[in-house]
């Protein structure tokens, strides 16, 4: 089957609810650069069908940073990391709520509360419950997602009772590869936590990290594992190779392949909220706006230990690509018109007619 027929088949199956084949998913990942826009256009047909032109903004709040006992090889907060990240213990509920409020003011519809560590103690869950309460009191309509690691019995239910709407725990990579990136817990531990969250009434959120040296087959494996797990939202991260981590020298991606990965995830999980997540700025670069034709969600602002694109630049990007921000009273185009990130014309003061070198 040629690629055009494969893409038509993927769209048809995405509409009818039929699962694609592994060969079809692999064909997307292995397609040529000449076919990239065809791949994106086909993925957009599913994105538009299920999500229109809306973009959901999510905002991360790192409640506790660094000093994690787990050895996840991609993570700047891992055991033994000498990356110069911020390290601090639990934020007070009012501090976390104030930080969340800034993201909500910037357009975020969901706040993601994250804490480093293997998993929370019951006292930690109490702390997070207080933080959820503080956020919900100030912003009753905002969604709150918790991401605290592996959960013990009853903790998911406690978070749900406190007002949490969702729980994130990423699969990250294929089950057969998981031991290559982490030895202190297992792939099945992660699956169990996502299922525990679902059983407690929390919306499950689980995604991947691409660029860790995995094969195309590994990427397809984890995409189909997510289809089976059926999370409501799927964050797609691209490895940020932090110096001081075992994967600090891994630069395996380019913008075109990132778009193909996003499209493959969309084809395999057509009705899920696919979120463009960590690493988008450094790996997609100027092709970020094109990714909005595949994904329907992004993180606004900074990540847990690294800086992201400026929030007003995110709004500008969404507006210029012709999309709207979900949940706002006005769309991103109107926000741009009101001056969000609007730049004045810069008068040339270099090159010909000056003593300064030209911009070349």
Swiss-Prot record:
InterPro entries: Aldolase_TIM, BATS_dom, Biotin_synth/BioAB, Biotin_synthase, Elp3/MiaA/NifB-like_rSAM, rSAM. Pfam families: BATS, Radical_SAM. CDD domains: Radical_SAM. GO terms for biological process: biotin biosynthetic process. [2Fe-2S] cluster binds at residues 112, 145, 205, 275. Keywords: 2Fe-2S, 4Fe-4S, Biotin biosynthesis, Iron, Iron-sulfur, Metal-binding, S-adenosyl-L-methionine, Transferase. [4Fe-4S] cluster binds at residues 68, 72, 75. PROSITE patterns: RADICAL_SAM (PS51918). Coiled coil: none annotated. Its EC number is 2.8.1.6. It catalyses: (4R,5S)-dethiobiotin + (sulfur carrier)-SH + 2 reduced [2Fe-2S]-[ferredoxin] + 2 S-adenosyl-L-methionine = (sulfur carrier)-H + biotin + 2 5'-deoxyadenosine + 2 L-methionine + 2 oxidized [2Fe-2S]-[ferredoxin]. Residues 53-280 form the Radical SAM core domain. Its cofactor is [4Fe-4S] cluster; [2Fe-2S] cluster. GO terms for molecular function: 2 iron, 2 sulfur cluster binding; 4 iron, 4 sulfur cluster binding; biotin synthase activity; iron ion binding. Pathway: Cofactor biosynthesis; biotin biosynthesis; biotin from 7,8-diaminononanoate: step 2/2. Binds 1 [4Fe-4S] cluster. The cluster is coordinated with 3 cysteines and an exchangeable S-adenosyl-L-methionine. Binds 1 [2Fe-2S] cluster. The cluster is coordinated with 3 cysteines and 1 arginine. SUPFAM superfamilies: Radical SAM enzymes (SSF102114). Homodimer. Belongs to the radical SAM superfamily. Biotin synthase family. PANTHER family: BIOTIN SYNTHASE (PTHR22976), BIOTIN SYNTHASE, MITOCHONDRIAL (PTHR22976:SF2). Catalyzes the conversion of dethiobiotin (DTB) to biotin by the insertion of a sulfur atom into dethiobiotin via a radical-based mechanism. This is Biotin synthase 2. It comes from Frankia casuarinae (strain DSM 45818 / CECT 9043 / HFP020203 / CcI3).
